[in-house]
């Protein structure tokens, strides 16, 4: 089996899937207490870095995605598949799991 080298540019989401770079979680509380990794909340905000071609309709056409590369999005807490590339964390999720575009 050949080794596969993954990078953001080599990940191409299929269908209505979206590849999102996860925003950094808070390192400490408002009171200044440092949080260990096990106590940090899983972030639910990130930036879209790749978008699939859209959901396939019954007639074979595609429904264009509502989000695009560069959009900052809020997504469901337990949605998608977590992927780590280097020191960065990403999540691959269905467009339906995106709750809002954040300005």
Swiss-Prot record:
SMART domains: Cpn10 (SM00883). It comes from the Bacteria. GO terms for cellular component: cytoplasm. Disulfide bonds: none annotated. Heptamer of 7 subunits arranged in a ring. Interacts with the chaperonin GroEL. Together with the chaperonin GroEL, plays an essential role in assisting protein folding. The GroEL-GroES system forms a nano-cage that allows encapsulation of the non-native substrate proteins and provides a physical environment optimized to promote and accelerate protein folding. GroES binds to the apical surface of the GroEL ring, thereby capping the opening of the GroEL channel. This is Co-chaperonin GroES. It comes from Synechococcus sp. (strain WH7803). The lineage of its organism: Bacteria, Bacillati, Cyanobacteriota, Cyanophyceae, Synechococcales.
